[in-house]
Amino acid sequence: MLKLLLKEGIELAKKVNSKAVVVISNQEVEERREDGILIFTAPKSYSMALDAFSHMEGDEYEGRKKLVDKFIKFSHAGEYISTMLYFRGIREEEAVVGVISTESINGVIIVDPERSEIQKTVDECSERFDPKVFRSILNISLNIAHKGREGRRLGTGFVIGDVDEVLKRSTQMVLNPFEGHPKKVRNITEPSTWESVMEFAQLDGVFIVDKQGTIMAAGRYIEVHTKELKLRQGLGGRHLSCAAITRETEAVSIVVSESGDISVYKDGDELIVINTHIF
């Protein structure tokens, strides 16, 4: 079945001028280019999650067909593919084809990344700082969520932009490890700095980053009121303070939780939550 679906997916990609076909399957598919189209597979953790979700039953749904249709067409599969493309650095302005072949679901879908939540978030945040900064911090956050440090899960936060106002509303908890270093070695868009960021993510507090990507501080404690924030229940102090600082300044915050989620805040609102376990 997968071979047939993949063939149809490639033909469809040609028709809609897509440069990529994303395969969601428990089976192995070699990453390759075919007729100029990149073919690659999503992590098996997602196809397993898709199957597990599809086997759920309850009065809320009128059978498996409605559940699967809602799941694929309206939320997870399309958003997942768009987010995966973003993390891989693939910017698709045209439609993207997804080929799904699992124990419970088989089909081909067309995804419009430009209408996805991740792209809407990128576009909205890019009004305030370089999109490269946003992409770099999200990729670092994904690494922190996946790897932690020395086998230990970590949580941390990044506050980006409006540095002067953010510094006024925060204090240094420990000696700032980035103070006095040249800007070049503090630029978060340079992969050579990421190891240092991973190391200092163990510090309490958050990173402060300017709109060009220069890391101004690590281990910074945000001092703002968190009352009247309209956020989901159960969030910890780091999430609340990082959300609140975006309400009082023009900054944007990205928070990595110890549970592995990545949250983005702007103007006191939560723009997106990314579950990193399926990437």
Model-derived features: where do they sit?
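Divalent-cation
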Residues: 2-249, 253-279
